[in-house]
Each structure stands twice: as C-alpha cells, then as structure tokens.
C-alpha cells in the first residue's frame, strides 16, 4: 500500500519525531538517509518503522519485523527536514545510557558544557569515538545529541558512544573523584 496523505498517522509521527516532539512521536527518534540507517542497523539499534518513498527499495539488512511504510515523494518530502531527501527514513528507539555506562573501566570522557550548535556536538561525538572515549556527558543548556543536525554530523557515532545528560552537580562529583 502506498500512503499518499500527509495526515496519515504514521507520517504525522515521523514528522513529529523530526521536529523533536518526543511526546508526539512516542519517544522515538527519526533518522533520514542511507548512511544513518546503515549505521543504526550496524549499531544494533531497534528500528520501529522504515519509511521509503516510491521507487526506493528497502535495504535487505532491515529486519522483517520492522514495519515498512511506503509513501509518495510528496508525502516523504513533507515529513523530513532535509532539502534533498534520499527517500528513506526510520523511527528508532534511542538508547538511554546511564552515567555508570560511561564510567565503566577506566573512563575517557568528553564533557560538552553549554554547547548549542548541534553540528559541533555531532562532530565532538564523532571525535570522541575516534579517540576511544567511553562516553560524552552533556550539561544543561547543551543541545540534544538526537537533534537532526547533530545526528548527521556524528555520522552515526551517537549510536555507539553513550551520550548522557548530567547536571553540574554530577560533574562536580566526578571532579572530587579525581576525574579530569
């Protein structure tokens, strides 16, 4: 079946996720494009729904348990935020790492304090992965790592490097434990 209505419930959920409305999207995160989809699959994330525009083929790596929604080009473009969409998007369950996940073994952590440019955060997460960091901590006022621009700039690293939002009190507690 080909969805041709912009008001279809699944399309509205995808649009809400792209706009960062977690409550309206059921807490799911939207990704767009072949590369991010491949990185999400490679990282073992749980895909809930894959959206493909007409004429696109669903990648064979997508598990058969994942719901596939085929949409017209017009509907696809109305739901995603990129100017030149690739015709494939997905809703996924974002990982929810804990501070303990980042602190396991000898930690190498990056703290992003008050970083507001999503592209910069994504680049830092990608660099953190390249340097073998156990995680990235973000303080209040820092943009979400699940922001669309941050996701693209991370090139999928945000799927593998735990990014944990912490308060300033937790950062201070880490300093008293000798973490620098």
Residue spans for each PLM region:
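N-terminal positively charged helical leader segments and presequences
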Residues: 1-83
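Generic hydrophobic secondary-structure packing signal
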Residues: 29, 36, 86, 123-124, ...
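RNA substrate-binding interface of SAM-dependent RNA methyltransferases
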Residues: 42, 91, 96-97, 101-180
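A common structural microfeature
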Residues: 47-49, 87, 175
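Short Pro/Gly-enriched coil loops immediately N-terminal to beta-strands
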Residues: 83-85, 156
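Conserved N-terminal subdomain of the carbohydrate kinase-like
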Residues: 85-91
């Amino acid at each position: 079946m080909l969805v041709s209505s912009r008001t279809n419930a699944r399309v509205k959920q995808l649009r809400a996720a792209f706009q960062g409305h977690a409550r309206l999207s059921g807490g799911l995160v939207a990704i767009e494009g072949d590369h991010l989809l491949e990185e999400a699959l490679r990282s073992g994330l749980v895909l809930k729904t894959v959206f493909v525009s007409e004429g696109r083929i669903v990648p064979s790596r997508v598990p058969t348990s994942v719901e596939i929604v085929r949409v017209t080009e017009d509907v696809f473009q109305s739901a995603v935020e990129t100017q030149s969409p690739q015709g494939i998007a997905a809703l996924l369950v974002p990982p929810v790492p804990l501070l303990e996940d980042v602190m396991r073994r000898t930690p190498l952590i990056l703290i992003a304090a008050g970083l507001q440019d999503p592209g910069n955060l994504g680049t830092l997460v990608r660099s953190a992965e390249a340097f073998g960091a156990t995680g990235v901590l973000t303080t209040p006022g820092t943009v979400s790592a699940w922001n669309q621009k941050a996701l693209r700039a991370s090139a999928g690293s945000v799927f593998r490097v735990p990014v944990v939002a912490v308060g300033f009190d937790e950062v201070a507690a880490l300093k008293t434990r000798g973490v620098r």
